[in-house]
From Swiss-Prot:
Catalyzes the irreversible NADPH-dependent deamination of GMP to IMP. It functions in the conversion of nucleobase, nucleoside and nucleotide derivatives of G to A nucleotides, and in maintaining the intracellular balance of A and G nucleotides. CDD domains: IMPDH (cd00381). GO terms for biological process: purine nucleotide metabolic process. Belongs to the IMPDH/GMPR family. GuaC type 2 subfamily. The gene is guaC. InterPro entries: Aldolase_TIM, GMP_reductase, GuaC_type_2, IMP_DH/GMP_Rdtase_CS, IMP_DH_GMPRt. NADP(+) binds at residues 202-225. PANTHER family: GMP REDUCTASE (PTHR43170:SF5). This is GMP reductase. GO terms for molecular function: GMP reductase activity. Keywords: NADP, Oxidoreductase.
């Protein structure tokens, strides 16, 4: 198996078939809806809040609300009142089952539910998927996070409608250092490996540092890409604004950090400061334009045409003929 990450790979251009990049369609379908771009902000407290989620939904983007210090029932009611879809996160503990029961009692069903735990290839996840499929069969269930083909096969067989791939590649994740496990440093290879066995959508989660990494993720099998740090330093980001030497930053921390947990126990995340770099709308528009450019370089007109592009591994022997054919 080839081992590489985003910075080690470049995609090879194919003959352009459009007169303008704006002709390229960066849209992607997930769970019966089509979204403008294959990007979803990380479901973290310093990346998304209710206002950002509502704006994303109204403007044709996918979102997943975080699950920390949140009344999920009220959140879904608020989203329904605004006339937009609801997309929430759940864990696998008793309060999460209670939340599902509350939805059933109220006759409410979020359109999307993400089972969001650090090690998603688990019996606890299997039980939660089964419970959701029984109680809220209309909801589209995303489950994760995982790192191996075996895990993707299991989650799909258990009933997940999509899987989230990536353990520890994020900028504020220290799972690799704390545990010795994860996809940090080879996330793109892990994605390729998992996508080979997947029959349902994969959301690549973590390790995205540049907009070009979105296209690389699509090329190696992702349907959607979850991004934290690039969307944490925006004017609207919910993280606390901090001034250092006259420059403005946003606080950004991992979901398993002591900053998020409020206690120093089983910590696998850290806190950093992200420079403020513009607005959400401008950033997403730039991402869309860059993805359109990627599609044109791939010789395509729609997002999945990127998968037809060949690639080279920088520093590798590139001996496989398929790379350059």
């Amino acid at each position: 198996m080839e081992i590489f990450d985003y910075e080690n790979v470049l995609l090879l251009p194919r003959k352009c078939r459009v007169e303008s990049r704006s002709e390229c369609n960066a849209g992607v379908a997930l769970g019966g809806r089509t979204f403008r771009i294959p990007v979803v902000p990380a479901n973290m407290k310093t990346v998304v809040d209710e206002n950002i989620c509502a704006w994303m939904a109204k403007n044709g983007y996918f979102y997943v609300m975080h699950r920390f210090d949140l009344d999920n029932l009220q959140f879904v009611k608020n989203m329904k009142a605004k006339g937009v879809y609801a997309s929430i996160s759940l864990g696998v503990k008793k309060p999460d089952y209670d939340t599902v029961d509350q939805f059933v009692a109220e006759g409410l069903a979020p359109e999307y539910i993400t089972i969001d735990i650090a090690h998603g290839h688990a019996d606890t996840v299997q039980r939660m998927i089964a419970y959701l499929k029984q109680k809220l069969p209309a909801s589209f269930v995303i489950a994760g996070n995982v790192a191996t083909p075996e895990a993707v096969i299991d989650l799909e067989n258990w009933g997940a409608d999509a899987t989230k791939v990536g353990i520890g590649p994020g900028k504020v994740c220290i799972t690799k250092m704390k545990t010795g496990f994860g996809t940090g440093g080879w996330q793109l290879s892990a994605l390729k490996w998992c996508a080979r066995v997947a029959t349902k959508p994969i959301i690549a989660d973590g390790g995205i540092r540049e907009h070009g990494d979105i296209a690389k993720s699509i090329r190696f099998g992702a349907t959607m890409v979850m991004i934290g740090s690039l969307l944490a330093g925006l004017e609207e980001s919910p993280g606390k604004t901090v001034e250092v030497d006259g420059k403005l930053f946003k606080e950004y921390y991992g979901s398993a950090s002591d900053f998020n947990k409020g206690e120093y126990k089983h910590v696998e995340g850290k806190r950093i400061l992200e420079p403020i770099k513009g607005t959400l709308a401008d950033t997403l528009r730039e991402m869309e334009e860059d993805i359109q450019s990627s599609i044109s370089y791939a010789g395509g007109k729609k997002l999945m045409d990127i998968r037809k592009a060949n690639y080279v591994i920088l520093g590798g022997d590139n001996a496989g003929e398929h790379l350059l054919m």
